[in-house]
């Protein structure tokens, strides 16, 4: 592998992966340094996206418990299933990280770990 690059981006978070993709689209030989196995940085892997997914599920559960009855929707036996919530969160993260991986491959960006 030729280790000469026009652009080396440090980090594959929201700014990093966009920078790497755009650089490659402009014809620059691009690499992205990311210490994690998966692309997307903190936001996608353990920060913003996972927490928003769990928060959304929790808010829907709360509305179902507290507000649906006011609308004539009975939810007497509603219960929270944390393993399913976590699975949904993990699927969301996986889908998005795979999307970034696809864009890196499509644009011939080298992922340096």
Feature map (PLM): residue ranges:
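Beta1/beta-strand and adjacent pyrophosphate-binding region of the FAD-binding site
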Residues: 1-13
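Glycine-rich flavin
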Residues: 2-4, 22, 26-28, 34-113
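Hydrophobic alpha-helical segments that mediate membrane insertion or helix-helix packing
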Residues: 9, 20-23
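N-terminal Rossmann-fold NAD(P) dinucleotide-binding loop
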Residues: 16-17
């Amino acid at each position: 592998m030729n280790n000469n690059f026009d652009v080396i981006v440090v980090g594959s978070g929201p700014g990093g992966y966009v920078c790497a993709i755009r650089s490659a689209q402009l014809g620059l030989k691009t690499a992205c340094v990311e210490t994690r196995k998966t692309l997307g940085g903190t936001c996608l892997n353990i920060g913003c996206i996972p927490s928003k997914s769990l928060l959304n599920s929790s808010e829907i559960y709360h509305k179902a418990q507290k507000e649906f009855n006011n609308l004539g929707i009975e939810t007497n036996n509603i219960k929270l299933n944390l393993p399913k919530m976590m699975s949904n969160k993990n699927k969301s993260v996986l889908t998005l990280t795979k999307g970034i991986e696809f864009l890196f491959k499509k644009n011939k960006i080298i992922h340096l770990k």
